[in-house]
Amino acid sequence: MSDFNRNVAAAQRVGADRALAIDAGLRAHMIRVYNYMAAAVGVTGVIAWLTFQMSATTNSAGQLVLTPLGQTLFGSWIVFALILAPLALVFFLSWRIDSLQAGTARLLFFVYAALLGVSLASIFLAYTESSITRVFFISAAAFGALSLWGYTTQRDLTGMGSFLIMGLFGIILASLVNLFLKSNAMDFIISIVGVLVFAGLTAWDTQKIKEMYDPMDDGTIGGRKAVMGALSLYLDFINLFLMLLRLVGDRR
């Protein structure tokens, strides 16, 4: 009987040790995801600011005007390349992730963040710097709270995914339509729905990243998962920020 009790206790200790190892591995994985995501946001912010500084200047009347570089980037067909290049890269990264080395995937992720930074320099032309800063910190606080909830909640958020993806496609379609309608009311509605959708996606993606973690993954697979998880959260944060900026940002 005593041998049986010892065997049971030993099995329980092994199970507890394995659970602790998985928990520690999951924490390390999530920290890596958040570090990649935060670094990419930093790259985007720095590149956007530097691009703006080189693309615009203030004239004698105190008005913001484009420099020759700014006219090239935002006043010609190149503006379409600035939009399409990051989009093409993120699709390539998503489709080819299984065939890429972890380091290559990470490099492409940061290249994407830099390209998007060039494109997002235009927000400094439309909004005041103080309101951009304010909305950034609001977005960061909201993102942190939503991601924490997605990580800690016991509720299964899987069912939310289909509705959120449908909402995302609805936002894209409505935004394309509004390019022609130029309706302020529709833009306001799109922004509100966008905030709700990307808030939900933040929690949903966080839980999905957590559930996709596997302690048996090797370094390459774990690295790929970290990059794709960081990319998902990065896109959630950037779009949440842009939607909030459209709602409460102060235009120049």
Task: Cite the ranges covered by each PLM segment.
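A hydrophobic alpha-helical transmembrane-helix feature that marks the membrane cores
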Residues: 1-252
